[in-house]
Amino acid sequence: MFCTSFPRPRCPQYSNPINVKISQFGIEFIRGFGEAMAPYFPGEATPSLGFRDHGYLYCVSPEGADAARARVEMQRSLGAHTVYLDQGALKDRFPWLNVEDLAGGSWGSKDEGWFDSMGLLNGFRRAARAEGVEYIDNAVTGLEVEDDRVTSVKLSTGEVVSCGTLVNAAGPRAQQVAAMTGLSIPVMPHKRYSFVFASETPVPGRMPNVIDLSGTFVRPEGELFLTGNTPLDDGPADFDDFAIRHDEFEDRIWPALWHRIPAFDALRVMQSWCGHYEYNMLDHNGIVGFHPQIRNFMFANGFSGHGLQQSPAVGRAVSELILYGAFQTLDLTPFRYERIAANEPFLEEAVI
């Protein structure tokens, strides 16, 4: 899964109402994380995710203005604090932004930003272990299926672990796990490059995460900046291919940054890395729920681009299905596996 030790984003600016609701629960969970985790950190400082409430700013072209306004209206109807800024208002609020080719921008004025991904992961792990969960550092090499159920899991060391319910949360390798039962899902690894850079000229004020028309995003990371984009040759990658292409920054990212934020005329890359999105090629949305034939095989896949921020709601949904056999809080039925088999996309357009 594409994730880093750098703070990762969360944002309810989706084209799909259910994704807005999922992320709204995410911000509620993130804000209450310290209190929820306190019992698992006795005698220690209450953990904090360092949430930076700077917002997201989606740049909007003249051709996309009507659709952007409609998305903002939908998001606000669900309680999100998104606002549409026309070209003049956008320049007034963010004077360092080049708006000449923009109709405006969609900006999350509250409850949007980024947080410490490793803090979230470590909190989850600590709480799970305290509740009796055992983590096994091993690779799954096979699944035994009998009477339409996964009965055991074979590990690379030869061990066999019995199975009551199997949740496929294997990220970019989700299809490899599905194939062990003869199933197929359109989730494949797609390479994404991230670059941390220094700028000779600072950007004043409270800078949001800016998503350019080109698909390039950039946001502050302390005194530095974090940026990335969708590579021009985007497509399924080898599972073990993490080679980075530095020309992606020189040829595509930097020109886009300089055009949108003229202060970025002199930059120096300080750090870079490559990770994999678990990319659902059908509709850019997650897959959540049991398989209709292999009854104890559950999917929780395909969320990259919005995975970390949606993990609290998806984790809760998975737990509800295991415990009660149905969703109890937020109905994630539209993410069901059956839409994959029927080739019925449930599209999400706002994925970075």
Question: Model-derived features: where do they sit?
Answer:
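Mid-domain beta-loop-alpha active-site segment that forms a flexible
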Residues: 105-127, 171-173, 249-256, 303, ...
